[in-house]
């Protein structure tokens, strides 16, 4: 027992004192707090913590100092002064400027205000006295300064401003053109003579002589000589007689002579000559000779001479002439339309005379028989007329002539253009020859 150290004794005493301070009724378990039983707190799920409301009006407590209950913290913000302020030598940042407490987290944060960034100014350190001294001037000094100023002299009215003038654009400076004289060396003329000049002469001239000129001489010239000249001699020369001089014959008189007279001569006269005159000669004259002997001379012989023989001879000649007109173009120009008209007129007169004699002799007995026979003859004559050319063929010929004339005009224009081109190339050849001679010198 004597060997117990002071450290153990001091620690025991210290623990006893702490136990007394923690529990006012003393320690029941001894000096060590580790053997003390802690009471368990019962947590009820039904009980809910109620929010504590702060009193609206707090009564003054004499024990506490004069404190104000603050529900929400309102930071003090300093607005930036717009006037010129005195700057500090050292930078200073206020603790309250731009401070905001977040209601959710409870932390304070600072707003980013561009006006407050930089040097901060303490409002209580502004030197207003210095500003007053600078701006304030006493009255005496002010009057002294005004007296020392020289008086203003009247210089008259202000000068009249210049009148605006029209805009004159600046003139463009003409850049002088430097003229260079090119001196050809000994090799250049030689190259020009052999390469450039020969290439121009050989290529251009050959193309003209071989290509263009041959085509003109062989193709165009031959076609002009064969086609155009031939058409002039054969067609155009013929058309002058037919269309130029003979237009009156073809269109004016000739239309009646060729178309109307032909139809009369071919259709009416043929039918009369072949049918009526033939029937008179063969049938009627024979019947008259057999039945009535007295009428043989009037109807038989008379009609044979007037209608039969005359019409037969005339009709054969007319048929040959018409065939020559439509078939042979060469003999068509040699025929005279007047002879053709006279023959047609004679045939018509002979037919009329024969018809008059027949009407007087026969009377009403042979009219029915003649009508039936005439119908058959007309059908035959219509078949003949269909085989012969009509007016449509003539119109086609005229259209073809017009087309040929247009083609001639086009070819003539081509000739003129070709001649102009040939003249141009001939001038070019002359120029090249002159240049070659000059270079040779």
From Swiss-Prot:
According to its UniProt entry, the function of this protein is described as: During infection, this phosphoprotein probably modulates the structure of the red cell membrane to the advantage of the parasite, although its precise function is not known.
Q: Where is the composition biased (Basic and acidic residues)?
A: 349-371
Q: For the region 2 X 9 AA tandem repeats, what residue ranges are annotated? A: 353-370
Is Phosphoprotein given among the entry's keywords? yes
Gene Ontology cellular-component annotations: plasma membrane
Which positions carry the signal peptide feature in this UniProt record? 1-15
- State where composition is biased (Acidic residues): 248-273, 312-332
* Membrane topology according to the record: Peripheral membrane protein
Note down the stretches annotated as region 16 X 8 AA tandem repeats: 186-313
sequence repeat segments run 186-193, 194-201, 202-209, 210-217, 218-225, 226-233, 234-241, 242-249, 250-257, 258-265, 266-273, 274-281, 282-289, 290-297, 298-305, 306-313, 353-360, 361-368
Write down the species.
Plasmodium chabaudi
User: Has the keyword Coiled coil been applied to this entry?
Assistant: no
Could you identify this protein by its name? Acidic phosphoprotein
Composition-biased stretches, type Basic residues, lie in: 372-415
Q: Where in the cell is it found?
A: Cell membrane
Tell me the domain of life. Eukaryota
What does the record's miscellaneous section state?
A: Associated with the host red cell membrane throughout the entire erythrocytic cycle.
The residues that carry sugar chains are 21, 112
Major localization class: membrane
């Amino acid at each position: 027992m004597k060997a117990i150290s002071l450290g153990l004794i001091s620690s025991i005493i210290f623990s006893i004192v702490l136990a007394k301070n923690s529990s006012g009724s003393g320690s029941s378990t001894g000096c060590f707090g580790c053997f003390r039983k802690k009471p368990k707190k019962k947590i009820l799920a039904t009980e809910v913590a109620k929010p504590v409301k702060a009193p609206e009006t707090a009564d003054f407590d004499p024990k506490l100092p004069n404190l104000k209950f603050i529900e929400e913290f309102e930071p003090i913000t300093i607005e930036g002064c717009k006037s010129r302020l005195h700057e500090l030598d050292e930078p200073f940042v206020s603790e309250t400027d731009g401070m905001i407490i977040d209601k959710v987290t409870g932390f304070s944060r600072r707003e980013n205000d561009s006006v407050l960034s930089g040097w901060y100014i303490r409002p209580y350190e502004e030197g207003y006295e210095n500003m007053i001294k600078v701006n304030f001037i006493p009255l005496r000094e002010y009057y002294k300064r005004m007296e020392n100023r020289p008086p203003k002299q009247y210089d008259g009215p202000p000068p009249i401003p210049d009148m605006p003038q029209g805009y004159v654009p600046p003139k463009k400076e003409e850049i002088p053109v430097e003229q260079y004289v090119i001196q050809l060396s000994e090799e250049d003329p030689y190259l020009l003579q052999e390469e450039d000049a020969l290439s121009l002469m050989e290529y251009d001239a050959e193309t003209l002589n071989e290509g263009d000129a041959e085509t003109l001489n062989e193709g165009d010239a031959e076609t002009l000589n064969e086609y155009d000249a031939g058409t002039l001699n054969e067609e155009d020369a013929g058309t002058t007689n037919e269309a130029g001089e003979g237009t009156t014959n073809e269109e004016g008189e000739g239309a009646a002579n060729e178309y109307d007279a032909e139809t009369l001569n071919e259709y009416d006269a043929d039918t009369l000559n072949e049918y009526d005159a033939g029937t008179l000669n063969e049938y009627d004259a024979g019947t008259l000779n057999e039945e009535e002997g007295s009428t043989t001379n009037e109807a038989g012989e008379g009609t044979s001479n007037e209608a039969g023989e005359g019409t037969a001879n005339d009709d054969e000649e007319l048929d040959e002439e018409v065939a020559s007109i439509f078939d042979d173009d060469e003999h068509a120009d040699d025929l005279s339309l007047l002879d053709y008209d006279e023959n047609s007129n004679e045939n018509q007169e002979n037919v009329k005379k024969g018809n008059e004699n027949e009407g007087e002799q026969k009377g009403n007995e042979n009219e029915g028989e003649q009508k039936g026979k005439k119908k058959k003859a007309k059908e035959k004559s219509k078949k003949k007329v269909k085989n012969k050319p009509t007016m449509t063929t003539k119109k086609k010929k005229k259209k073809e002539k017009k087309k040929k004339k247009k083609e001639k005009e086009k070819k003539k224009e081509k000739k003129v253009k070709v001649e102009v081109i040939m003249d141009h190339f001939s001038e070019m050849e002359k120029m090249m020859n002159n240049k070659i001679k000059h270079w040779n010198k």
